[in-house]
């Protein structure tokens, strides 16, 4: 059984069973890490939304906005962390306060008040935090930073995301990017050692919900062993 075939079948299962809501993105939102996975860089640039499955999600982002001052100033907020549950929500948007002046920017950096608004127009219940500089000093990547953050007892820690291995993501400008999140209970499988193929299959199997796992097992039993 080829890994590509099985991975493709799992991806199809996920596309129908897991993706349940859309995180709307605006130009001033610089998405850095989603559910422990790196999202920054040119691969994400231009995407206007991010598809997430039903369950808990954690995002690390910055607000970057050119201020209409003379001369022009590019405001950049500290890294912000927010955790929310996407259950029974079709879309989520990050609602920022007005940031048009340096004073607005300083105020937001000091006290970053923002909301996550669901498709019903009401704010979601969230946990939020600001990533402090001491978290950044000893880490080489943002994935490493968030893994260390998530094993600690902080306001927006999600221990399940500390064990997720990194994976590449891509986006086409103006389109969406599918991303898996956490469904409770969450299980993880580390990818290491010689039998990476088997462990990768285990990892993706454990990310699926129980119904998807049952469907996959039924399908797998019908496949010939080569």
UniProtKB/Swiss-Prot annotation:
The keyword Signal applies. Disulfide bonds: none annotated. It holds the Pfam family DUF2057. The keyword Lipoprotein does not apply. InterPro entries: UPF0319 (IPR018635). Keywords: Signal. It comes from the Bacteria. Residues 1-20 form the signal peptide. Belongs to the UPF0319 family. PANTHER family: UPF0319 PROTEIN YCCT. This is UPF0319 protein YPO1442/y2728/YP_1333. It comes from Yersinia pestis. The lineage of its organism: Bacteria, Pseudomonadati, Pseudomonadota, Gammaproteobacteria, Enterobacterales.
């Amino acid at each position: 059984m080829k890994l590509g075939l099985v991975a493709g079948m799992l991806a199809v299962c996920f596309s129908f069973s897991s993706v349940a809501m859309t995180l709307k993105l605006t130009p001033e939102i610089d998405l850095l890490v989603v559910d422990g996975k790196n999202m920054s860089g040119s691969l994400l640039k231009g995407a206007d939304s991010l598809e997430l499955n039903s369950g808990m999600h954690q995002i690390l982002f910055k607000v970057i906005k050119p201020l209409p001052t003379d001369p022009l100033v590019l405001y950049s907020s500290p890294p912000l962390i927010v955790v929310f549950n996407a259950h029974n929500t079709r879309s989520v948007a990050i609602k920022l306060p007005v940031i048009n002046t340096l004073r607005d920017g300083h105020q937001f950096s000091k006290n970053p008040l923002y909301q996550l608004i669901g498709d019903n127009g009401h704010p979601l219940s969230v946990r939020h935090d600001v990533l402090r500089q001491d978290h950044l000093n000893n880490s080489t990547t943002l994935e490493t930073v968030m893994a260390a953050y998530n094993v600690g007892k902080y306001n927006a820690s999600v221990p399940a995301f500390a064990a997720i291995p990194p994976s590449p993501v891509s986006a086409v400008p103006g389109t969406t990017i599918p991303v898996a999140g956490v469904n409770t209970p969450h299980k993880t499988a580390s990818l290491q050692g010689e039998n990476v193929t088997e462990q990768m299959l285990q990892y993706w199997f454990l990310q699926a919900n129980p119904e998807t796992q049952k469907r996959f097992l039924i399908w797998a039993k019908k496949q010939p062993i080569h």
